[in-house]
């Protein structure tokens, strides 16, 4: 009998040991404050840090920007606050009684205590899958996820603790094994649409907590839309409700499809009179998304530490952006020591868990593991018609999980050239090119670690680099190490292509209900089917769902006199023809049927080759064809997160209130995702 999992309120979730806490192992950015600048101002002021580490302390602060300071009433003897004093008031915390077993406390200031966040979304599957030790109190019932006879109108203590923390109202901080523990934003760079974009970083995301489950799995919880950070540039660091809804639903939809992804724990908003987010079309409701992943480090986290040559001679002058201190050179510089520290962390137990021996070289293995994971991830994207929309190198995870849901879309009509991002005028990130763009990102990782790989191979003979590994090394030697690393990139590219093709084929064969692999399955079964979809502009997802009802026994023999068999086949063809999104003409339906007739006969023959395998695995004389259809339905869901549904959901959330609004997301998560098969 298994022992029940111990539950903890959010603010008391157990932290990992300090050896697995990212901020205790990666380098904190020294803000290099200009003389007289207040640290509370500094954490909100955008800066380019030429060579400054991996992360910067910043508390979540979901308030409007530009900041609006209250005007003092001179008649009452009030003194006008300056920006430093005003921001300091937000983070002058009142100590709260709390169990210190977790080593941290949830803290609130007088100003923060006036914030009134509302929890409008909570994912039970996220909790069950990755945070089974989290006690959310009555929050699931409050948001309508779990139905009870008495629907609570207020959150209980654990539920309120959750919303206070995941909305950014309260700040989790304290001491862990004698070391400070604070919220932070990560520093990274990236190539955007193929062009070096310089320092980017978490402009509207704050990592607030790391925790470890009873079975040893580490998770990081990050708030998106929680206010300005040192990487916000001229932006406000906030998120509108529609963007929060899109990521909340898509992350959980991807998880339901078994596509590697970050997870969405919760979605919060604030009353309009308290916070409105100003965008192109005027004020909009806000959102703060709590998302979860083992780490949110990405390929851009490495690029910032070893930027391409042109970046090392590029000055950054941007609206709202200051240099990294006393007005010094703001071009990015190589940080060899920071590169080593980050690489060791990512290769270790808290990252990829490569299982390296003491002193074993990690450069090649890290790159190959990141490449393999991302190749499998993008294969799943292709098989399920998911278009990310903006595969910049700063949006590609080192874990090979889908992150940063922006202008994404699941294709409706099957179109290899589908572009979901209206800003992608040249189609760089269209559906067909997604594997190539992932390879581009992996190549950027190879370039960032090229000198590490070269040094470990040429100089250290398979041993890992150590502290000071590039200190005093001349440029000629560095270039030679870089060439060795770049040559390894060719091997990585071959591996990515092979891994992608194998995973792509495996996942598609699952969707086609095939248990074995044959060399010609891709061209004969998969590609031929997709060509029919493209030729007739059929709905990608509906076509697979209908195909899940196909049985080889539907194919009539040429000499058969069984009219029911012929009727079943014609009825099935009719259903396939109805997968045209717009009401098809009889002529169009006839063309679709004619295209499918020969393909279905070939498909039926291929399926029948596996009848013995199916029959052997069955019990109680179950019909193998029906059992196969059941398996296909599990991987070809009837529910897909389509754009019209997102728009309809967002409208309901923007216009609704109270329990009715909270039930909107709960209904989709529960009815649509759970019952997807």
Where are these regions (language model features)?
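Conserved ATP-binding subdomain of kinase catalytic cores across diverse folds
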Residues: 105, 112-356, 399-401, 441, ...
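Residue-level recognition of short, well-ordered coil/turn positions
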Residues: 259, 386, 657-658
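Active-site-adjacent bridging/hinge elements
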Residues: 94-101, 219-230, 343-347, 351, ...
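Regulatory N- and C-terminal appendages and interdomain linkers associated
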Residues: 1-186, 434-677
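Hydrophobic residue at the +6 position relative to the catalytic HRD Asp in the kinase catalytic loop
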Residues: 389-398
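ATP-dependent phospho-/nucleotidyl transfer catalytic cores
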Residues: 244, 274, 281-388, 401-524, ...
């Amino acid at each position: 009998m298994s022992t029940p999992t111990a539950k903890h309120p959010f603010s008391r979730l157990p932290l990992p040991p300090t050896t697995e806490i990212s901020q205790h192992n990666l380098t904190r950015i020294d803000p290099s404050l200009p003389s007289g600048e207040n640290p509370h101002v500094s954490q909100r002021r955008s800066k380019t840090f030429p060579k400054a580490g991996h992360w910067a302390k910043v508390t979540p602060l979901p308030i409007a920007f530009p900041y609006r300071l209250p005007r003092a009433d001179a008649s009452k003897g009030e003194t006008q606050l300056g920006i430093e004093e005003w921001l300091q008031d937000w983070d002058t915390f009142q100590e709260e009684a709390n169990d210190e077993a977790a080593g941290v406390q949830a803290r609130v200031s007088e100003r923060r205590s006036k914030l009134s966040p509302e929890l409008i979304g909570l994912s039970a599957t996220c909790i069950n899958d990755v945070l089974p030790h989290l006690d959310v109190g009555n929050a699931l019932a409050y948001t309508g996820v779990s139905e009870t006879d008495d629907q609570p109108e207020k959150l209980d203590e654990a539920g309120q603790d959750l919303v206070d923390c995941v909305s950014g109202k309260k700040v989790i901080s304290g001491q862990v094994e004698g070391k400070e523990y604070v919220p932070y934003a990560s520093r990274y760079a990236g190539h955007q649409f193929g062009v070096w974009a310089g320092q980017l970083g978490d402009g509207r995301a704050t990592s607030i907590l790391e925790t470890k489950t009873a079975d040893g799995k580490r998770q990081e919880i990050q708030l998106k839309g929680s206010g300005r950070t040192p990487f916000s540039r001229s932006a406000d660091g906030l998120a509108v409700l529609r963007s929060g809804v899109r990521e909340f639903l898509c992350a959980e939809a991807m998880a339901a499809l078994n596509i590697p992804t970050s997870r969405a724990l919760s979605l919060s908003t604030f009353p309009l009179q308290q916070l409105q987010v100003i965008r192109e079309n005027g004020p909009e409701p806000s959102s703060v998304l709590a998302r979860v992943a083992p780490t949110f480090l990405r390929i851009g986290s490495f690029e910032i530490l070893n930027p391409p040559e042109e970046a090392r001679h590029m000055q950054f002058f941007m609206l709202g952006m200051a240099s990294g201190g006393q007005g010094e050179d703001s071009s990015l510089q190589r940080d060899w020591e920071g590169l080593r520290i980050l690489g060791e962390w990512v290769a270790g137990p808290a990252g990829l868990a490569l299982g390296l021996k003491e002193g074993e070289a990690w450069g090649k293995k890290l790159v190959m593991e990141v490449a393999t994971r991302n190749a499998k991830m993008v294969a799943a994207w292709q098989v399920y018609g998911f278009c990310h929309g903006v595969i910049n190198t700063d949006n590609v995870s080192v874990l090979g999980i889908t992150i940063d849901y922006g202008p994404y879309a699941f294709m409706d009509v099957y179109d290899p050239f589908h572009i979901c991002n209206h800003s992608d005028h040249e189609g760089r990130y269209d559906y067909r090119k997604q594997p190539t763009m992932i390879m581009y990102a992996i190549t950027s990782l190879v370039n960032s670690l090229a000198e590490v790989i070269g040094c470990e191979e040429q100089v250290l003979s398979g041993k890992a680099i150590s502290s000071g590994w590039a200190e005093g090394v001349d440029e000629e030697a560095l270039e030679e190490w870089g060439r060795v690393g770049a040559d390894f990139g060719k091997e990585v590219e071959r591996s990515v292509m092979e891994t992608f093709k194998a995973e792509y084929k495996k996942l598609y064969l699952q969707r086609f209900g095939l248990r074995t692999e044959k060399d010609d399955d891709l061209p004969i079964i998969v590609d031929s089917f997709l060509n029919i979809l493209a030729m007739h502009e059929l709905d990608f997802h509906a076509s697979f769902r209908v195909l899940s009802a196909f049985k080889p026994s539907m194919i009539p023999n040429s000499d058969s006199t069984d009219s029911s068999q012929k009727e079943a086949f014609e009825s099935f063809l009719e259903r396939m023809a109805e997968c045209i999104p717009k009401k098809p003409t009889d002529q169009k339906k006839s063309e679709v049927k004619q295209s499918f007739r020969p393909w279905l006969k070939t498909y039926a023959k291929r399926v029948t080759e596996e009848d013995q395998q199916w029959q052997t695995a069955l019990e109680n004389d179950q019909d193998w064809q029906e059992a196969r259809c059941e398996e296909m339905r599990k991987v070809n869901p009837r529910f897909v997160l389509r754009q019209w549904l997102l728009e309809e959901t967002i409208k309901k959330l923007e216009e609704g209130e109270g329990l009715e609004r909270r039930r909107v997301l709960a209904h989709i998560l529960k009815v649509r995702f759970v019952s997807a098969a």
